[in-house]
């Protein structure tokens, strides 16, 4: 990656870990999606390809760009480590998390619009899968750094089949694994 990355220097745990393994941090999702957009636009064969991305803005400390919308309030900067931020900041941290999701949802929507412009959307299998949930002290710990409770293990999966597929859309509300 040639663009900018971010690393929350206030989070000593991840900052120290990243320095030890000599990585520079996370790539903002806007840049990840722009690289994906350019890659797809330059494909010769837009009928058969695989693209996998790992979006990071919804991971602690919930990256928000300067242009990000913040409908969930109150919300401000806060100090704290992954898995060890002060309980008194729970509402602020949760709102930052929700704002990060709100903005990532808009980024994914824009990527879907791009796939439609490229005439790829109707024929593609498109999946969005969460890697973990997030806790906000419901069971005495934050983030996903403690015991396995629903808050940290329950996540989502969205699967959009190609239009010509014979698979019928469904909403599944019971636990499954991926």
Model-derived segments and their meaning:
Residues 18-20, 91, 139-142, 167-169:
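Short acidic, glycine/proline-rich loop/turn micro-motifs
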């Amino acid at each position: 990656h040639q663009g900018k990355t971010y690393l929350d220097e206030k989070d000593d745990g991840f900052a120290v870990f990243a320095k030890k393994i000599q990585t520079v941090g996370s790539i903002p999702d806007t840049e990840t999606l722009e690289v994906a957009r350019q890659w797809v636009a330059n494909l010769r064969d837009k009928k058969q390809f695989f693209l996998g991305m790992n979006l990071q803005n919804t991971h602690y400390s919930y990256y928000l760009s300067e242009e990000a919308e913040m409908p969930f309030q109150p919300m401000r900067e806060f100090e704290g480590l992954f898995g060890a931020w002060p309980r008194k900041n729970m509402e602020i941290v949760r709102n930052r998390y929700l704002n990060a999701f709100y903005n990532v949802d808009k980024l994914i929507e824009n990527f879907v619009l791009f796939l439609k412009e490229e005439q790829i959307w109707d024929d593609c299998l498109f999946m969005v899968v969460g890697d973990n949930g997030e806790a906000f002290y419901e069971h005495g710990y934050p983030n996903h750094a403690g015991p396995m409770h629903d808050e940290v293990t329950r996540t989502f999966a969205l699967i959009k089949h190609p239009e010509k597929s014979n698979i019928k859309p469904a909403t599944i509300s019971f636990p499954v694994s991926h």
